[in-house]
Amino acid sequence: MTEELKNRLLSILKFVFAAVLFIAVVATLYHELAHINFKQTLEAFSKINRWYLVGLFICGGSAMILLSLYDLILVKGLKLDIPLIRVFKISYIINALNAIVGFGGFIGAGFRAFIYKNYTTDRKKLVHAISIILISMLMGLSLLSILVVLHIFDASHIINKVSWVRWILYVVALFLPLFIAYTMINPIDRNNKYLGVYCTLVSSFEWLAAATVLYLSTVIVDINIAFTTVIGIFIIAALSGLVSFIPGGFGAFDLVVLLGLKSLGVPEEKVLLALLLYRFAYYFVPVIIALILSTFEFGSSARKYFEESKYFVPARDVTSFLFSYQKDIIAKIPSFALATLVLITSFVFFINNITIVYDGLYDDHHFAYYIMLSVHTSACLLLLINVRGVFKQSRRAILFVMISLVLIFSATIYTYASLILLSWILLIFILLILAYRRSKVMKRPFRLKRLIFTIILSMLVLYVNHFIISETLYALDIYHIEMDTSLLKYYFWLTILVVVILVGIVAWLLGSRYTRPHQLEDLSRCKSIIETYGGNYLSHLIYSGDKDVFMHEAQQAFLMYRYKGNALVVLGDPIGDTKAFQSLLIDFYNYGEKLGYDIIFYQVSDRFMPLYHNFGNQFFKLGEEAIIDLTQFTTSGKKRRGFRATLNKFDDLNIQFEILEPPFSKDLIFQLKQVSNQWLDGRNEMHFSVGQFTEEYLQQAPIGIMKNEEGKVIAFCTLMPTYYNEAISVDLIRWLPDLDLPLMDGLYLHMLLWGKDKGYKAFNMGMATLSNVGQLNYSYPRERVAGRVFEHFNGLYRFQGLRKYKEKYSPNWEPRFLVYRKDSSLWYSMLKVMRVIRHK
């Protein structure tokens, strides 16, 4: 059998053992809890003095401080240059987390290695010291097991009934002398020969502190058992929890304590309540404190400290890849901690809905209580659905949570007025104020799938909330008010109404300030950039008047875009110095992220696809643009006789083509307006990706016109200078629809010949939408569906047959793409673009 196979079999056996043990513990615990009267448990809890609870929670939070001595010994032994206050804070955070998800202390050991490696160059010595701390956590129990064997702590009622427990205590007790001997023979260095002894003593005090918290929990619920007996039961229960490999010993520890106290004649209801208080005081309270400390201890300052550490610099090249992720994780700890606190707050106050209903049932002012219940529930729901927003440091989410806390605070004062909970709300509110001031993101981009998920989650949470309230009241056999005479039957809809009102108010407050950003009245700088660095096929549309401009900080490049529907839709590629494009996009994406806007690029070329890809985008091919090589274009030859026939027909009708330079007279504008109105036939102008018929736009470039023999304009096209690849393009092409003449062909042919005569090398005929898009069976279904929507719901222009029409000019086809974020929906992004194009 190979070594690899042995290790694999050993891992499987460990997993099977842990799983079987866990199932057995759960089954036994379920059997024991099935006989418990939960009504009596709740009644016993309601009779507990609240100040006793506060004292217990303080003891639980303080007990974790003893574990900081591990880190103090470590820092002093290795002579690490860390302020003591920082050591205590980091240690408290590590130990609180380790208590919940410790897996035998490995989580805590990993965090210690992660934090302290930046303060030493001798990583081997650090790992050795941490391993001693890890093992010594068990040695404390070994020392206490010796005291149980010596009957200093009394567990005889368990040992006498279950004989194999005695042998487990003997075996565990033997670990201590072996560990002490090993650490003294193989110390980390000469100066730390007694490190194992010191850590064992710390471990012993820590286990005794935890046992004391359990004893105080039993005292509070009126269990009269001697201190030494409770400690003895605790030690055996702690050993059971360690053997189970379950984080925190959940299940195994509780089962042993339950059976141990039950064998002494203690009612199960009291034991359950004592265990719940112990778990809350020794595990939950320290985690809360650790989360609060994390919001201050980690972040930009800690990140900067690690980056500037003299021990980190030499290893930067070696570990830069891993460290790049580690420092990002450290920076996110404060927001994660605050989001967790908000989540806990939401759950706690959802549970307190039971108290409001209970008080309302016995109060004469039922309506006031149930209105408060709706407000309270709405606020709790807003806390829950904004947890992710708080983690993402969204100001809007933080503002939602702050408003929700104000409502919960008001409802709490009116109803059950718990001083502990009111203090908790104030603490979280202060943390949120600090987070709001640090936040640089106004809101997160809107996502339809996120909205659907939020609605489903909200409905589910409200249903579960109602179910828990009704089942709790039923289980407690509490008097019920008739639903027909109570406002309680409208509770669900009142909650929805309050949520909608709150969301609407906050959305309006934030949204009204950021609707048309970066409007630019003076386009002279844009014109200068185009003349200096060149433009593209769409750069002339800067003069259409329906776009905003995002300018590069050094004014070397810019973007044309439009704000619509919580999105910034950019037209084409950036314009200007290509060397400035990356920094321009970084600034633009930072700006969009700050305000919570989606960023979509429309009709971009494939020149800068790698650049767009770097920003986490994906692509959809919109179609292909027809580019005619004017150096090869001709009307001569057999294949071009159709072109010659068209031109000859216009000559026979004495229809003339002419290029006019601006400025244009009022009379000409009036004639062009008449042609445009008849061509539109009551339809609205399109926007954004094409120009509109406005005098300001027409005055920016030459216009090609076709006149009949009376000199009346019957067709026209507006030129689009590109300052790019010696190319020319046209924008508006309009003619009198009543005339049975191929006027569009005539305009194109005359423009092609004119452009060739003027020395241009390329002519852009525009895009054939969905050309070669979603045509194969292997194409993404969503792309084919989105392409059909984009094609059939764009009513002004007909794209069917457009490629076939342009093919007769023998163009070269260049692809054009839609660029959108990878976490955004394709069809929803295209709908946003359509809104921009179809609405001014």
Curated annotation (Swiss-Prot):
GO terms for cellular component: plasma membrane. It catalyses: L-lysyl-tRNA(Lys) + a 1,2-diacyl-sn-glycero-3-phospho-(1'-sn-glycerol) = a 1,2-diacyl-sn-glycero-3-phospho-1'-(3'-O-L-lysyl)-sn-glycerol + tRNA(Lys). Residues 30-52, 111-129, 189-193, 251-271, 357-366, 472-490 are extracellular. It is a multi-pass membrane protein. Keywords: Antibiotic resistance, Cell membrane, Lipid metabolism, Membrane, Transferase, Transmembrane, Transmembrane helix, Virulence. Residues 1-8, 74-89, 151-167, 217-229, 293-335, 388-394, 437-450, 512-840 are cytoplasmic. The keyword DNA damage does not apply. One of its GO terms (biological process) is response to antibiotic. The chain crosses the membrane at residues 9-29, 53-73, 90-110, 130-150, 168-188, 194-216, 230-250, 272-292, 336-356, 367-387, 395-415, 416-436, 451-471, 491-511. It is found in: Cell membrane. Its EC number is 2.3.2.3. The keyword Glycoprotein does not apply. One of its GO terms (molecular function) is phosphatidylglycerol lysyltransferase activity. It is an enzyme of class 2 (transferase). InterPro entries: Acyl_CoA_acyltransferase, L-PG_synthase/AglD, LPG_synthase_C, PG_lysyltransferase. PANTHER family: PHOSPHATIDYLGLYCEROL LYSYLTRANSFERASE (PTHR34697:SF2). Catalyzes the transfer of a lysyl group from L-lysyl-tRNA(Lys) to membrane-bound phosphatidylglycerol (PG), which produces lysylphosphatidylglycerol (LPG), a major component of the bacterial membrane with a positive net charge. LPG synthesis contributes to bacterial virulence as it is involved in the resistance mechanism against cationic antimicrobial peptides (CAMP) produces by the host's immune system (defensins, cathelicidins) and by the competing microorganisms (bacteriocins). Belongs to the LPG synthase family. This is Phosphatidylglycerol lysyltransferase. It comes from Staphylococcus haemolyticus (strain JCSC1435).
